[in-house]
A protein has these predicted regions:
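ABC-type ATPase nucleotide-binding domains, specifically the catalytic core motifs of the NBD
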Residues: 7, 13-34, 47, 142
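P-loop NTP-binding/switch modules centered on Walker-like glycine-rich loops
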Residues: 77, 82-86, 90-171
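Charged, flexible cofactor/metal-binding loops and thiol motifs
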Residues: 143-228
Length: 228
């Protein structure tokens, strides 16, 4: 499911024809009527009217385009859906609708979902397991509930500290000093070390990054496991 549904469609070809093109490529033996029926089923699944197939992309709202992108992603019967920031540029109400559609389709078809996002609230709602990444490397991975309740890596804690809470008194959100590293050059040791608030105490910034299991199904970068 593409990052920006606004730019995912060819502007001069109707939505239905673009989905039929994918179906023809993957299922060359399908008849035209079979493909039309498949598109109708997909549109019903994501909450779109059949008439959307005969419209051009500019005739659809942002939310409708994103629903159509989800239908396109499902058209070839995948086992895994990769959703890359699928609610970018949509208002909050439409975002919630799209997320509900993705969850509904996931449960209906029994799909695995890889959801890529910087939105902590969405990750908490949509996932069973999470992998926190920094500078292209996974620094912590495990069950969502466990990591939210007991974050171990300094970057994971910093992410959660930067998210406003609806509970308790208002307080100033924390931020990290410095900037993310350039990925052009090879990084020796821990890529988070220059910004890590624990680098002088509990971390080992010279250790090359790799995951170690600290609890059942809970993995964290070895750099954060002390100066041993």
């Amino acid at each position: 499911v593409f990052h920006g549904a606004m730019n995912a469609w060819n502007p001069v070809i109707k939505i239905g024809e673009q989905i039929r093109e994918a179906l023809r490529e993957h299922y060359p033996d399908n008849s035209k009527q079979t493909n039309i029926q498949k598109i109708q089923e997909l549109f019903k699944m994501v909450g779109l009217d059949d008439t959307v197939a005969d419209r051009y992309p500019h005739e659809l709202s942002g939310g409708m385009k994103q629903r159509a992108v989800i239908a396109l992603a499902l058209s070839c019967d995948p086992k895994i859906i990769i959703a890359d920031e699928p609610t970018t540029a949509l208002d909050v109400v439409i975002q919630d609708q799209i997320l509900n559609e993705i969850k509904k389709v996931q449960e209906l078809l029994g799909l695995s979902l890889i959801y890529i996002s910087h939105d902590i609230a969405v990750i908490a709602e949509m996932t069973d397991k999470i992998a926190v990444m920094y500078a292209g490397s996974i620094v912590e991975m495990g069950p969502t509930k466990k990591i939210f309740e007991n974050p171990v890596h300094s970057y994971t804690r910093a992410l959660l500290d930067s998210t406003p809470s609806i509970r308790g008194e208002k307080k100033k959100l924390k931020s990290l000093d410095g900037e993310p590293p350039s990925l052009i050059n090879k990084i020796d040791g821990c890529s988070f070390a220059p910004r890590c608030p624990d680098k002088e105490t509990s971390c080992n910034p010279t250790e090359h990054m790799r995951l170690v299991e600290i609890a059942p199904d809970h993995f964290v970068d070895i750099c954060s496991q002390g100066k041993e």
